[in-house]
Amino acid sequence: MPKMKTNRAAAKRFKVTGSGRIRRSKGGLNHCMQEKSKKRLRRLRKNDMVDSAMEKRVKLLLPYG
């Protein structure tokens, strides 16, 4: 049986934590920053967890994660 391929796009966007949850970064920090409030930009810098509904799909993309 050949090895399963990791989806490289997903590998760059998601990290699996020690407990098996999946960490992701928030979008909206690349351009048009002047229009966004400082509070909003500060909140967007924090990482977030993938919700349980999407976790199963992301794990299929990261077979060795």
Curated annotation (Swiss-Prot):
InterPro entries: Ribosomal_bL35, Ribosomal_bL35-like, Ribosomal_bL35_CS, Ribosomal_bL35_sf. GO terms for molecular function: structural constituent of ribosome. One of its GO terms (cellular component) is cytosolic large ribosomal subunit. Keywords: Ribonucleoprotein, Ribosomal protein. The keyword Oxidoreductase does not apply. It comes from the Bacteria. One of its GO terms (biological process) is translation. PANTHER family: 54S RIBOSOMAL PROTEIN BL35M, LARGE RIBOSOMAL SUBUNIT PROTEIN BL35M. NCBIfam families: rpmI_bact. Belongs to the bacterial ribosomal protein bL35 family. This is Large ribosomal subunit protein bL35.
